[in-house]
Curated annotation (Swiss-Prot):
Organism: Salmonella schwarzengrund (strain CVM19633)
A GO molecular-function descriptor: metal ion binding
An annotated GO cellular component: plasma membrane
Signal peptide (residue range): none
Pfam families in UniProt: Nramp (PF01566)
Role description: H(+)-stimulated, divalent metal cation uptake system.
Disulfide bond residue pairs: none
This protein's record includes keyword Cell membrane: yes
Keyword annotations of the record: Cell inner membrane, Cell membrane, Ion transport, Membrane, Symport, Transmembrane, Transmembrane helix, Transport
Highest taxon of source: Bacteria
Gene for this chain: mntH
HAMAP family with a match to the protein in the record: NRAMP
The protein, known as: Divalent metal cation transporter MntH
Cytoplasmic side: 1-19, 72-95, 146-155, 221-238, 298-327, 371-387
Amino acid sequence: MTDNRVENSSGRAARKLRLALMGPAFIAAIGYIDPGNFATNIQAGASFGYQLLWVVVWANLMAMLIQILSAKLGIATGKNLAEQIRDHYPRPVVWFYWVQAEIIAMATDLAEFIGAAIGFKLILGVSLLQGAVLTGIATFLILMLQRRGQKPLEKVIGGLLLFVAAAYIVELFFSQPDMAQLGKGMVIPALPNPEAVFLAAGVLGATIMPHVIYLHSSLTQHLHGGTRQQRYSATKWDVAIAMTIAGFVNLAMMATAAAAFHFSGHTGIADLDQAYLTLEPLLSHAAATVFGLSLVAAGLSSTVVGTLAGQVVMQGFVRFHIPLWVRRTITMLPSFIVILMGLDPTRILVMSQVLLSFGIALALVPLLIFTSNATLMGELVNTRRVKQIGWIIVVLVVALNIWLLVGTVMGLS
């Protein structure tokens, strides 16, 4: 009887710790459903139906492992990835890493900010510039929560992630995809032509985001409670739940586009405005509105996450700190310049995804090196199998992103 009480008590304590440590992965997961994912998944679903769903499944599994490694680095060492690079690499390398990470954070933010502005434009009927102003105000308000600590921000961003997931449950109800074909597309790899290969590379490139690799290790480095092993165990649950939700959203985006556009003959849908305007007559005004709201929620939350990531890389690499509101103001400027110049926002979204491809390997390689170092990681060091899978992911991601980059430059998209 005593043994049972002790067992029940330890089980309750483990569940309590797991719940207390839940949140960082939800912030990181937002990076996986940003407006760049909207654009890529919609184009893939409209062009090839359910045939590229398997890419989303595998990309999400890869992203899940990467985020676990990032979170584990913070737990095991008490330092984030940027700080580890600063401590172990020569100063010129560190400065190079800082500059490229800042550029990538700004490119990411550009896509996310413009995506949210497009969402406001679609649902409110305002101009893109007015949508950008609303986006700026909303992100300032969300960032103010950071003054109260990490938990309130985790709750708001986690809530926005769940809202986007709920929105896509509604979209699936409206679009009524063929579940048998959807299941087949998730498990049977298919690349019917070179354009499909290009889009598959785009889906992967839009899924694995370098800025959240830096950010996640920062979100877990100050976690308290339990042993390191217990914190790591709780974090794996956090990542599994958050990334499963993000994976569902990406699958639902592509499946909705397939059901609504591909099988109705609208295979040329390539931008967010067009997707919104086509959804209304095909499904309903409600379906189009839900799409617009989900785009706003994803854009707002991901642009906040991008601002936080930029702060982490600056503090980590060069020990320099500026207030979040100053960083938010500076990183908004490129978005307003793009809008005022009248550039195509969807094309800017795509170009920003290509720019991100440069930073993925630069973040992944040191992450794998550090998490495979027994001196740094102790009992949380990577197993041989994790190392092997990690390096396979690095090679695959680099190869596909080179393909994506070359294809974009050559105008194959």
